[in-house]
Amino acid sequence: MAVQKIIITPILVFLVTIFFNVSSSSSSNNSQYQFLNHGVRSAYWPAGDDFSPSLIDTNYFTHILLAFIQPEPISFKLEITKSGIKWGQNFIKALRHRSPPVKTLLSIGGGGSNSTLFSEIASTKQNREIFINSTIEVARKYRFDGVDLDWEFPETQQDMFNLGLLYEEWYNALFAEAKVRRKPRLLLTSAVYYNSTVRLIGKHGPRSYPTQAINKYLDWASPMCFDYHGTWDNNTDFNAALYDSKSEISTNFGLHSWIKSGVRPEKLVMGLALYGRAWELKDPNVNGVGAEAVGPATDTDGSMNYNEILKFNKQSGANVVYDKVAISFYSYAGTTWIGYDDGPSITTKVRFAKSLGLKGYFFWALGKDKDWSISKQASNAWGH
């Protein structure tokens, strides 16, 4: 998931203190976890996004994750600066009196963050303790309900082993802190690779997640079931196919790999993408899945949010195809080809997740579905 730096300032203390005085009933042990009884319907809000958090319709979500804050490279404590105060205040104000209420988590890391830094943090007990204590301090100070780690990605099997130690010590610290302060324990979650084994090209080869630690210490893990294909490929393909008979790169394979690895289904929250990937076709007359492409069709990396895709399809009169085998959409017009998800594919994926006994799903990211049509269909499919 794309990294954006979160900034927290002391000025927010007053705002969030008011919030939790007004909402003191949410501090009970029962209310902290009542959201988990009927599943998790969550989404990330990218820090500094031009989509105001005041526009978030909480009817469709149980948890909102604020993304992202980074650890400092020397102290290993969470980085807190004086900039970014405006969006920070807006986030707190927007969610403090919402009905229905949502739980908020502070997410650490993100795509493009420093994987080597996380490796160093996780490598020793002292480093882990400094980092963990900082996360608890910040989360409590600004009244979050939990913390989320998005380490993309551990690069060695030793990293994975150390990640398991980090989960264990983090959970134990959260449990002890909650007991001392007589408060509900902060939630602990982690965004992970779509597969239980990371097979990204690298000198260290495949490495598997610490599944026992995930079962024992996380409230849930969130496989990122997207970014399977993109403009780094020379041929068009789906961003987040549910099924792929030609390879292991699919949500079906990934989620089953997690379950086969020993992670209990109720510990998994499936990732969904509110964006697609756009290619420039080499030949506009060759426009199916697997067509040759010459690069991204946009000025960025080919990423287009759901609203932009709908606008493109309408304005260009694009041909829209629902692949009922892959359970994903693509559209094409001229030399532009886009792979993405729409209502029917999202609905099928959510029902698939529920059939596996998963805890829920999450979206990356809020602001890309401004009319809430996809969010609503996902929530309905979950049975809320």
Swiss-Prot record:
Which reactions does this protein catalyse?
Answer: Random endo-hydrolysis of N-acetyl-beta-D-glucosaminide (1->4)-beta-linkages in chitin and chitodextrins
Positions annotated as glycosylated: 29, 114, 133, 195, 234
**Cleaved signal peptide residues:** 1-27
- Enzyme kind, highest EC tier: hydrolase
Instruction: Supply the Pfam families for this chain.
Output: Glyco_hydro_18
Reported EC number(s) for this entry are 3.2.1.14
Task: List, alphabetically, the SUPFAM superfamilies matched.
Answer: (Trans)glycosidases, Chitinase insertion domain
The active site annotation covers 152 (proton donor)
The biological pathway it contributes to is: Glycan degradation; chitin degradation
Start and end of every GH18 domain? 39-384
Q: Which GO terms describe its biological process?
A: chitin catabolic process; defense response to fungus; polysaccharide catabolic process
For this UniProt entry, what's an example GO CC term? extracellular region
Protein role: Possesses chitinase activity in vitro toward glycol chitin, carboxymethyl-chitin, colloidal chitin, and the chitin oligosaccharides (N-acetylglucosamine) (GlcNAc)6 and (GlcNAc)5. Hydrolyzes (GlcNAc)6 into (GlcNAc)4 and (GlcNAc)2, or two (GlcNAc)3 molecules. Has the capacity to inhibit hyphal growth of the fungus Trichoderma viride in an agar-plate bioassay.
So what family is this one in? Belongs to the glycosyl hydrolase 18 family. Chitinase class V subfamily.
What is the designated name of this protein? Answer: Class V chitinase CHIT5a
